[in-house]
Amino acid sequence: MVSIRPDEISSILKQQIADYDKSVSVSNVGTVLQIGDGIARVYGLEKVMAGELVEFEDGTEGIALNLEDDNVGVVLMGEALGVQEGSTVKATGKIASVPVGEAMLGRVVNPLGQQIDGKGEIATTDTRLIESIAPGIIKRKSVHEPMQTGITSIDAMIPIGRGQRELIIGDRQTGKTAIAIDTIINQKGQDVVCVYVAVGQKQASVANVVEVLKEKGALDYTIIVNAGASEAAALQYLAPYTGAAIAEHFMYQGKATLVIYDDLTKQAQAYRQMSLLLRRPLGREAYPGDVFYCHSRLLERAAKLSDAMGAGSMTSLPIIETQAGDVSAYIPTNVISITDGQIFLSSDLFNSGLRPAINVGISVSRVGGAAQTKAIKKIAGTLKLELAQFDELAAFSQFASDLDEATQKQLGRGKRLRELLKQPQFDPLNLAEQVAIVYAGVKGLIDEVPEEKVVNFARELRDYLKTNKADFLKNVLSEKVLSEASESMLKDAISEVKSSMLAA
């Protein structure tokens, strides 16, 4: 028979009483009622806030977007294969945030800031909220520094300033991404941090962009945020805000940053998908009523900060894809009204061989003029007007049989200007080279050069300046003005190249 030892029992009880933990944990918990199409309906979660992160049993995260009387609509950030009806959901009390900092440079991340390039974890402890309020009026300064794209037609006629929002708009396959990538490549040595946000793109296209940037030595100062076409709609919707948050970190440290959103059409479509699945009321083109706010709160985060705030800047280049050149559709008109100008790419110009295929007539920069350097402003003033007049004359001349000499001369110059502005992909020009090329065209110094040789002339002029007139390049780049001495050097170079071409 087992003997009972009261002393041992009492010592065990005393030990357990001594070890008793009085702390009580209270968590806001709910239950999944319904799951499908990346949306979960959750019962409970009474104290959850709009936009709050919630966590499912299997570790999947979601965002509470719809707060209804009897349930909460949650969008899932991931596949959520382990989430089922009856699973428990816990409110985290946090809003989505991403890692930020120098360690992100040269990396490819997803919209949650997790690495997807296989180079190991990102060693940074700094984080920033994905959604944050844009700087107010007092914290800003007017745009006054140029953001050189390296594309002559943009820097001469549609100049972009640091802190500006310039829309790149056009049909598919018209070179929108090419302009954005050229701009990133042109920031080499300028101490500008670039963020490229790919939304709904093919993985092969993003891999190609990474490869080009690596080849050109531009990946060292670039961060790529990728939400591919196969990702959940919630991640495609979040990606641009993640890119803005990463750039903001550097902006508030006093650095210049450039963010490219490629493209916001796909983000709007992802947001529409989420909203329709959440049973939100729909508006024009089935987009929800707050799709304008979705884009405006993103693009308002671009700013040129005041000196008191560190004088940093964030320049945004959102991309919008149009259908058959229709810029009056809902999303294009929304983003045009939010941004400080647009670069319109035409498929007709692209197919006719003019690349970059910029339609100068309807492209505009509303604030960039104040940021344009004096050197190019001085000579490019008449360029846009001449090209606009050429377009009118070219249309008119199709119906006219005999044209007077002045009209023929103007048409000839317009054609040569068009040829001069042609530029191969991934070959940005510096300021001095742009000044030289625009000067040659506007001053009529290449009117005798045959039209088919103009592209070669531009290339040879660049090579000649690099080898024989290095002082010209150095002076213009350092002084940012075209002095009389530089102008005479340029005239000599143009006449040398022209005479050697005409003699050949």
UniProtKB/Swiss-Prot annotation:
InterPro entries given in the database record: ATP_synth_asu-like_sf, ATP_synth_asu_C, ATP_synth_asu_C_sf, ATP_synth_F1_a_nt-bd_dom, ATP_synth_F1_asu, ATPase_a/bsu_AS, ATPase_F1/V1/A1_a/bsu_N, ATPase_F1/V1/A1_a/bsu_N_sf
Domain of life: Bacteria
SUPFAM superfamilies registered for this protein in UniProt: C-terminal domain of alpha and beta subunits of F1 ATP synthase, N-terminal domain of alpha and beta subunits of F1 ATP synthase, P-loop containing nucleoside triphosphate hydrolases
Residues noted as binding ATP in the record, renumbered to the chain: 170-177
Enzyme class: translocase
Pfam families, sorted: ATP-synt_ab, ATP-synt_ab_C, ATP-synt_ab_N
UniProt GO MF annotations: ADP binding; ATP binding; proton-transporting ATP synthase activity, rotational mechanism
Keywords: ATP synthesis, ATP-binding, CF(1), Hydrogen ion transport, Ion transport, Membrane, Nucleotide-binding, Thylakoid, Translocase, Transport
Compartment(s) where it occurs, according to its Swiss-Prot or TrEMBL record: Cellular thylakoid membrane
Alphabetical list of CDD domains matching this protein: ATP-synt_F1_alpha_C, ATP-synt_F1_alpha_N, F1-ATPase_alpha_CD
Chief place of localization: membrane
Residues with site note (Required for activity): 363
A GO cellular-component term linked to this record: plasma membrane-derived thylakoid membrane
Protein task: Produces ATP from ADP in the presence of a proton gradient across the membrane. The alpha chain is a regulatory subunit.
Record text on subunit structure and interactions: F-type ATPases have 2 components, CF(1) - the catalytic core - and CF(0) - the membrane proton channel. CF(1) has five subunits: alpha(3), beta(3), gamma(1), delta(1), epsilon(1). CF(0) has four main subunits: a(1), b(1), b'(1) and c(9-12).
Annotated family: Belongs to the ATPase alpha/beta chains family.
Name of the molecule in the record: ATP synthase subunit alpha
Origin species: Prochlorococcus marinus (strain NATL1A)
Lineage: Bacteria, Bacillati, Cyanobacteriota, Cyanophyceae, Synechococcales
